Structures are given as structure tokens and as C-alpha cells.
Regions:
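N-proximal low-complexity "stem/linker" segments adjacent to membrane-targeting elements
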Residues: 1-35, 39
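Glycine-rich, basic loop-to-helix element that forms the pyrophosphate-binding segment
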Residues: 37, 78-89
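Short, acidic, metal-binding catalytic loop of nucleotide-sugar glycosyltransferases
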Residues: 39-48
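A conserved acidic beta->alpha catalytic loop
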Residues: 53-66
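Conserved donor nucleotide-binding strand/loop of the catalytic core
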Residues: 65-82, 167-168
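Active-site nucleotide-sugar/metal-binding loop of Leloir-type enzymes
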Residues: 85-100
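The conserved acidic donor/metal-binding loop of glycosyltransferases
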Residues: 101-106
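Catalytic-site signature of metal-activated, phosphate-bearing donor transferases
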Residues: 110-300
Length: 300
């Protein structure tokens, strides 16, 4: 199959199942992180993955084509966002879709107890079409050169820390109508006064409809009803291969230790809620309690 600049590689059937939660990714030489990312999102409850690969030569394609729940497309263009939008509009309509980078792990309030399909069912119930997230850079409490990751192991076992503060929110006129700044990258770029802070807000979880488009990465999208709850993307760029991902934009080297006064070790979603980095609401909390109670066997 050829669609725009995407050519289908695998020949697996794609079932017509509207209940599937589908993830969409772009890959290029991502074998170091790929299995860890796929495992995390499978455990959340993602049913099927659609991947646009930009010509990987490090074994990424072999891993993708060997996975029975992954559909692989060769991307021949330079615009990864256009490829994602093409895939989403071909295979996403009617589904809850999760669009992430291979270096990102999606988390949301109560993700430890509430599987992603049930969380999406809750969002449907309250009339939401999407959920926004903050991107949190994860790093080790040791020099960057020591953050050697073993493929397939949990990424948090290699990089378990993030900046707990400061983060700032500003309003904008593009959906989701706000942007978040701060965190580690702002710290590395000279602080909030330097004017170099990258945008950390994303809209990765969307109930896709025909004609929707991501506009500037996954940070902006054509207008949708954004949920009053918020999640996070744990971002694992700062492994020992950091130069391939962010070495050009940041003044860091193998001896740099990113651990600082604002660093905390990731624990769970409750911690992120307490820090004000993600958000829950009472109706979601009550839904989780009911779901948990229904699973608990009654004593005789």
C-alpha cells in the first residue's frame, strides 16, 4: 500500500474493531528504546501500533516487523508530522489514538489501576475528545555518559529523575489553548529569563475523526474538546546516546550530571498530581474507586 509518502511494509490484517486503542509513532534508528516503549504502552492497554519508519538501519525495522501488533510503513519524505497525520487519518478515525515518540512513555492519573481503554471510556462519558500532557525530561543521578540503557529493560531503571519545578503555563489561541514551559530544558538553556524555553505541552491522546490534523508537532491540533484532566509524557532523551537526540541544542557532554536542587525520583501518578504536574478531577477519582471495588472479590 502506498499512501502519500508512506509505503506499507507488513502484510498483517488490520481488524475493523472500533474498541481498539491505537498508538502512532515515527521511528528512526530507535532500537535502544523501542522494546521498552512498546512494552510500557502494551501494559497500559494499547491494542495496536502504527509506525512510520524513516529508514532505520540499526535493527529497529526487524523489531517492528517481528511484533504481531505492529503495522509498519516506510516513510520516504522528510516531514514526519505529515506522515503521522496521514497514518492517523487512514487508521485512526473512530478510535482513541495515542501519538508519542519512541523516547516518550505516556502516563495519566491512576494509570497504575485504570487501564487505558477504561480511561478512554471515562473521557467518552464526560464528552472529551482529547487530553493534554506535559513533557517531563527524565535523567539519571549520575553523569550522562553513565546512563547506559539495556534494551528491553524499563527506561525508568536507567533514568528515574525529573525536575519537579518550576513550570509555567501561558494561554494561546491554538488548541489546546495553553502552552507549558520550564523544567530541565529551560534550566539548561539559561532559565526562564533567557527566552529560549521549549514548549512542553502536548496533545497525544485524541479520539480521532476524519480531517483532524496535528499542526506543530503534537503540541497543537485542530480544535477539539480537551479534557479537564491532564497527563504526562516521560521523555527519555538523556541516555548515553544523548548526542544523537539533543547534543546539538544543549551545552552538555558525557561528564554533565543533570541532577540538581529541583530533581526528584519518579514514583507514581499520585506524586505527579501532588506536584501539580498532572491533574485529576473528582469524577475520575470516583470512577477509579468503583472500578477497583468491582474487581475486589467479596469475602464469604
Amino acid at each position: 500500500m502506498t499512501d502519500g509518502e508512506l509505503t506499507r511494509i507488513d502484510g498483517r490484517p488490520i481488524p475493523d474493531n472500533r474498541h481498539e486503542v491505537r498508538a502512532f509513532l515515527v521511528t528512526f534508528n530507535d532500537s535502544l528504546r523501542l522494546q521498552s516503549a512498546l512494552t510500557h504502552h502494551r501494559q497500559l492497554g494499547v491494542d495496536r501500533f502504527f509506525v512510520a519508519d524513516g529508514g532505520s538501519t540499526d535493527g529497529t525495522l526487524d523489531q517492528l516487523t517481528a511484533a504481531p501488533d505492529v503495522h509498519v510503513f516506510a516513510a520516504t519524505g522528510d516531514d514526519g508530522l505529515a506522515g503521522l497525520n496521514t497514518l492517523l487519518n487512514a487508521y485512526g478515525p473512530g478510535h482513541w489514538t495515542l501519538t508519542v515518540d519512541v523516547s516518550e512513555l505516556f502516563v495519566y492519573p491512576h494509570y497504575e489501576e485504570l487501564e487505558l481503554p477504561l480511561f478512554c471510556r471515562y473521557l467518552n462519558h464526560v464528552g472529551s475528545q482529547a487530553m493534554a500532557c506535559v513533557s517531563l525530561d527524565m535523567y539519571a543521578a549520575s553523569p550522562l555518559g553513565d546512563a547506559v540503557h539495556r534494551p528491553g529493560t524499563p527506561l525508568r531503571s536507567t533514568c528515574g529523575y525529573f525536575d519537579s519545578a518550576p513550570y509555567q503555563l501561558s494561554r494561546t489561541d491554538m488548541c489546546p489553548y495553553f502552552e507549558i514551559y520550564g523544567g530541565l530544558r529551560e534550566r539548561l538553556m539559561g532559565g526562564p529569563g533567557a527566552g529560549l524555553s521549549p514548549v512542553l505541552s502536548r496533545v497525544p491522546l485524541v479520539r480521532w475523526q476524519h480531517g483532524m490534523q496535528y499542526l506543530r508537532g503534537t503540541g497543537n491540533i485542530t480544535p477539539v474538546i480537551v479534557a479537564n484532566v491532564m497527563g504526562a509524557l516521560l521523555r527519555f532523551d538523556f541516555l548515553s546516546d544523548f548526542r544523537d537526540r539533543c547534543g546539538a541544542e544543549l551545552a552538555i557532554d558525557e561528564s554533565t550530571n543533570l541532577y540538581g536542587a529541583a530533581s526528584v525520583k519518579f514514583e507514581n501518578s499520585a506524586q505527579l498530581i501532588q506536584l501539580g504536574l498532572i491533574k485529576t478531577v473528582r469524577s475520575l477519582d470516583e470512577s477509579v474507586k468503583l472500578t477497583t471495588a468491582a474487581r475486589t472479590p467479596k469475602s464469604a
